[in-house]
Amino acid sequence: MDGWRRMPRWGLLLLLWGSCTFGLPTDTTTFKRIFLKRMPSIRESLKERGVDMARLGPEWSQPMKRLALGNTTSSVILTNYMDTQYYGEIGIGTPPQTFKVVFDTGSSNVWVPSSKCSRLYTACVYHKLFDASDSSSYKHNGTELTLRYSTGTVSGFLSQDIITVGGITVTQMFGEVTEMPALPFMLAEFDGVVGMGFIEQAIGRVTPIFDNILSQGVLKEDVFSFYYNRDSENAQSLGGQIVLGGSDPQHYEGNFHYINLIKTGVWQIQMKGVSVGSSTLLCEDGCLALVDTGASYISGSTSSIEKLMEALGAKKRLFDYVVKCNEGPTLPDISFHLGGKEYTLTSADYVFQESYSSKKLCTLAIHAMDIPPPTGPTWALGATFIRKFYTEFDRRNNRIGFALAR
């Protein structure tokens, strides 16, 4: 394993286990730090249980969903969380009911399972359920909410209550899910989702939670940032953190390099090329890239990823690309050209060994994903990229900043 990492069986999902401030300033503005832990993804759980992914059908490899509110369907295509590796914790209601959630820059709505979900839905049995009758601050709304995933439909209705995140409380409209398919959600370590995107992506134009936090004026800056610990060997180590209102200099070095968003409303930037070794192989004429905290891997169009995998000598196995483990350390660097700077991943960053596999094959943390217009075609830079580069999402200036993580 010289020079690269082994992916442990518990994977890289994160469980938020606490929050604190970086200090206690005398004024009312500050920024909050949320600590995170690791847990397994849905796909990892399926593989560990010996599930034949090929028999589940091709829809399980398509990391997309379509959101709808009432009779209106959004054109936003987002991750289906099959490979999501990071999640945290929020409280809903008075007193707070605690939920494990994915913090997703690719979506803008908040949803958790509801106590009104029938126990005929096995996935609801295995998750924490929000009980409105236990909250003194709950307000009924009732507007129908539907999330159509490639692997099944999640539906419910909108409600309003107080949500606590990172020590901040906000009054927030959120979805109470009453119907959710057993697969994949029965195996999900997370209960729901907190969208960190823009109101333009929000179904029903529901104000996103970060917008509501900003309206209170409690943060030092109109930004939030993500750090994912690259130490995959120690399950008890700090898994990472989300900072609301700033960035943590303990976890990056040097200065941030900023790239403006393509347009307001989506965390998407311009990319000027993808290099393998010293040769620019893809995106020579420019392309788009989402920065997606709800995704584990780096993804691109099928045609682009096939060309990239051919250059790396990787073979397709079901929905993954693999190489012989002894070849992993010899694979070339992959560089992403963003804002006039190259962001380089070594094989140690994008190759991992599945500890539940008896074969000496290692998986590449790069997948094919075809996203249609208007968002796509686009690349998506998920946890594989964010682990290497501390990422700041700047709402005030509509830009994303990267700095080398440490």
From Swiss-Prot:
Subcellular location(s) per record: Secreted; Membrane
Family: Belongs to the peptidase A1 family.
Disulfide bond sites: C117-C124, C283-C287, C325-C362
Protein function: Renin is a highly specific endopeptidase, whose only known function is to generate angiotensin I from angiotensinogen in the plasma, initiating a cascade of reactions that produce an elevation of blood pressure and increased sodium retention by the kidney.
Glycan-modified residues: N71, N141
UniProt keyword annotation of Thylakoid present: no
Catalytic activity reported: Cleavage of Leu-|-Xaa bond in angiotensinogen to generate angiotensin I
A family per Pfam: A1_Propeptide
Record text on activity regulation: Interaction with ATP6AP2 results in a 5-fold increased efficiency in angiotensinogen processing.
Record's subunit section: Interacts with ATP6AP2.
Gene giving rise to this polypeptide: REN
Protein name in the entry: Renin
Entry's Gene Ontology molecular function annotations: aspartic-type endopeptidase activity
Lineage of the species this protein comes from: Eukaryota, Metazoa, Chordata, Craniata, Vertebrata
Propeptide boundaries: 24-66
Active site as annotated: D104, D292
Gene Ontology biological-process annotations: angiotensin maturation
